[in-house]
């Protein structure tokens, strides 16, 4: 199973491609899509869409794991993040991938056992699971790897350990169902 984990952002979007072979995790690829805040949000969204599309074409993941939106003090930042996430959801559906979403606290809990873990702890555990000695920077990349690992670990355990439920499909199926039933609205 190959999972593409994405830590979305309107200026920096981290990604991590992880392969799970039985109980062994391997790093396939990871990186950061760097954008300029001087670019229009529409241009940034197109770049993110195109670059993630190229990553999907190259590595052929079966699933995309995405960090859920969080409430930000700045409404404009939250709206931009929502637009980026919407483009990633549309890309995922257009490519026929499963979409799973995880809250930051859930990723931290699954990887470290503590929902309030810091970025250093998540980075350490992501490197531990992937057997990587050297640091991976920036944290957007290790967060994306953590999201992919969280998805694979939850899948191996039959669902999120905090919720005790089955797999965490996109927004309880909301976006996935909408995109499937309204393909003509997807660009």
Curated annotation (Swiss-Prot):
Binds 2 Mg(2+) ion per subunit. Mg(2+) 2 binds at residue 67. It is an enzyme of class 3 (hydrolase). Mg(2+) 1 binds at residues 7, 140. One of its GO terms (biological process) is DNA repair. Gene3D superfamilies: Ribonuclease H-like superfamily/Ribonuclease H. Its EC number is 3.1.21.10. InterPro entries: RNaseH-like_sf, RNaseH_sf, X-over_junc_endoDNase_Mg_BS, X-over_junc_endoDNase_RuvC. It is found in: Cytoplasm. Keywords: Cytoplasm, DNA damage, DNA recombination, DNA repair, DNA-binding, Endonuclease, Hydrolase, Magnesium, Metal-binding, Nuclease. It catalyses: Endonucleolytic cleavage at a junction such as a reciprocal single-stranded crossover between two homologous DNA duplexes (Holliday junction). Pfam families: RuvC. Its cofactor is Mg(2+). Belongs to the RuvC family. This is Crossover junction endodeoxyribonuclease RuvC. It comes from Prosthecochloris aestuarii (strain DSM 271 / SK 413). The lineage of its organism: Bacteria, Pseudomonadati, Chlorobiota, Chlorobiia, Chlorobiales.
